[in-house]
Amino acid sequence: VAKKSFLLTLRYLASRFSILLLLQLATQIVFIAATHNSSTVNAGMHLLVRENKQIPIKLSAKTDFEHESTDLIANVLYRRLSGLQKSMMPNGANGANVLWISNQARRWYIEEQRYGEDLIIGGLINNDPQAIEAGFKMFDWGFAHQVDDGSFFITGDRFHSTSFFVQSVAHTLLVIEQSPYSEKYANQVAKYKPLVHRATRWMILPNVWKKGIRRNEPYTHRRYLVAAALGLTGKLTGDEELIKYSRKSIKDGLSLQRPDGVNPEKGGHDSSYQTVGVMYAQRWVTYFPNDSLIPKVVQMIDKSLSWEQTRILPSGEISTKGNTRTGGREKIRDGSRYKKVGPGSQIRAFAYWASVTGNQKWEETARKLTKFYYKIP
């Protein structure tokens, strides 16, 4: 009888224990399903998985426009918008494309027109209509060279250059929609939306995508650029296929990060392109805060910025030692000078992430950089 009673007790405990396990598992499944692939802008609490532990993290519910309006971005990076117009012709052609128009260069690059993004967003934040109109003029010149399949006629480095321009336009239009001037510039948003959508549909054509991704292989930052270009356009237009492609690019980028936080460029580290990639990944986080990839993207950004901090000298200057692409390694498109190291992408990456996470250590780093490069206390 005692043995039978003991066995019955074991069965009872086993059944209760199984129910508890099932309840716990069901709770986790419901939570994960609720956070998977949601495209709402309002960020809540997400799960960051580290070493098989679920650690809750909080991301700001602020809009991208509000992040762009934070002190250092608004008052330092967007302070001198007139300087961005100096390289632009009255017809809107910008940078290396000016040389192409005057037959001084063999190629033009659609990416050179992406600086309309800074002019428009900076103009929205600082109430500068002249800068906004100059930005639209840059975009207009670019789209004037778009052909029926969505690509840009004989632009150099077609896939990569297009991804730069697409990201800038999609990002700009989304920020306009969040700004107090959304009604004023509604016609411009309506005009550019189908044009940028057509460009992204060209990017994901099987033969175009395959070739473009192959050419992007040595450059980690391009994974996050492509993800932002396609993801933000998908968000803007409601095209879910673009968002799926953007997630592919995010996953590819995540797989490349080294244990020390480096996102490699041409087989090594680069203290400039490190933050360029982070900047685009941060935008992806802002627009897809509840996607199931977010915990890993947040972890990648934290590690990337922590490594970048090791490249900042006590003075606030960014070290170029060992860089594979900037600081005397590669020249800009028109060949007039070597690529510099920041400080724009570095200040933006740290300041923006401080706004998203509320972590003031990133803000302190951004201010340290600002003090050195802009002599602002």
Language-model segments: what does each one mean?
Residues 85-89, 143-147, 257-258, 312:
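Glutamine-centric residue-chemistry signal
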Residues 96-198, 204:
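N-terminal catalytic cores of secreted or lumenal carbohydrate-active enzymes
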Residues 16-30:
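Bacterial N-terminal signal peptides
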Residues 29-47:
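Signal peptide processing junction and immediate N-terminal pro/mature segment
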Residues 79, 103-114, 130, 156-168, ...:
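Aromatic- and histidine-enriched alpha-helix N-cap/loop-to-helix transition segments
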Residues 1-14:
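N-terminal secretory signal peptides that target proteins for export/translocation
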Residues 43-114, 122-125, 129-137, 197, ...:
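Low-complexity, Ser/Thr/Pro/Gly-enriched N-terminal "stalk/linker" regions
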Residues 94, 197-377:
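Extracellular polysaccharide-recognition and catalytic grooves
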